[in-house]
């Protein structure tokens, strides 16, 4: 092999390695946060605990994101209590991570229903709107929009963060619907789609 051929082969191999490394590093980590857990039930109406729904939907979203090749970290995988500060710490371990906290809503006025998302920063707003757009476009309920709110998990998280409220379990109709596996599948599909669409803009 001539010196010129060797040098050409070396730099070709080097370039491929650099491109592969860049592609690997470009993968955005998504941190999914199933709200509440353990001693913290969250909302509880008509025998349904929010913490259980949150974890179920988060696990479904995880599967869908991983099928798209998006790496996922969960703040909890079982019915355990995780403090708000520690949830943010988990997200902050991953530079550039996208953090999504999954919840179900409740209100003393049982007629209130709908889906809404929350954010703290301009980038978080884009993430929240991406999920809100898809959820509201697919699900027959009130579109309560994306709003800025100083939730602790959002303010303590350094990266892009949003919180999604998947429906009011205090509303009897939404409670029954959210209690079904097929509906939680739909929620997961649209949340995952919204997250993936946002990640594609990074």
Name what the model sees in each region.
Residues 1-4:
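N-terminal secretory signal peptides that target proteins for export/translocation
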Residues 9-20:
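Bacterial N-terminal signal peptides
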Residues 28-47:
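Short glycine-rich His-centered loop
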Residues 27-29, 48, 52-202:
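Active-site-proximal helix/loop segments of hydrolytic enzymes
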Residues 21-26:
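Sec/Tat signal peptide C-region and signal peptidase I cleavage site
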């Amino acid at each position: 092999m001539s010196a010129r051929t060797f040098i050409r082969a070396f730099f070709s191999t080097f370039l491929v390695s650099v491109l592969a490394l860049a592609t690997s590093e470009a993968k955005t980590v998504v941190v999914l946060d199933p709200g509440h857990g353990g001693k913290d039930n969250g909302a509880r109406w008509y025998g349904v605990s929010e913490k259980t729904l949150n974890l179920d939907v988060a696990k479904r979203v995880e599967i869908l994101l991983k099928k798209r090749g998006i790496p996922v970290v969960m703040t909890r995988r079982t019915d355990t209590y995780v403090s708000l500060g520690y949830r943010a710490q988990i997200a902050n371990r991953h530079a550039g991570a996208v953090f999504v906290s999954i919840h179900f809503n409740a209100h003393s006025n049982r007629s209130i229903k709908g889906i809404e998302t929350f954010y703290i920063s301009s980038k978080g707003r884009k993430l929240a709107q991406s999920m809100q757009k898809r959820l509201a476009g697919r699900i027959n309920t009130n579109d309560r929009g994306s709003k800025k709110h100083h939730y602790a998990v959002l303010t303590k998280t350094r990266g892009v963060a949003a919180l999604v409220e998947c429906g009011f379990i205090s509303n009897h109709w939404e409670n029954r619907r959210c209690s079904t596996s097929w509906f939680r599948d739909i929620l997961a599909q649209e949340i995952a789609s919204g997250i993936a669409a946002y990640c594609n803009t990074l």
